[in-house]
């Protein structure tokens, strides 16, 4: 099970992190 998590986690971050930074920049633009 740990092997599956080790391979899935990087993929999850590659998909999740850009979405978070995209929303973050949108919120920052909205405040300014």
From Swiss-Prot:
GO terms for molecular function: toxin activity. InterPro entries: Amanitin/phalloidin. It comes from the Eukaryota. Residues 1-10, 19-32 form a propeptide. The keyword DNA repair does not apply. Probable toxin that belongs to the MSDIN-like toxin family responsible for a large number of food poisoning cases and deaths. This is MSDIN-like toxin proprotein 1.
């Amino acid at each position: 099970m740990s092997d599956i998590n080790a391979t899935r986690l990087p993929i999850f971050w590659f998909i999740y992190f850009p979405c978070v930074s995209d929303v973050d920049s949108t919120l920052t633009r909205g405040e300014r």
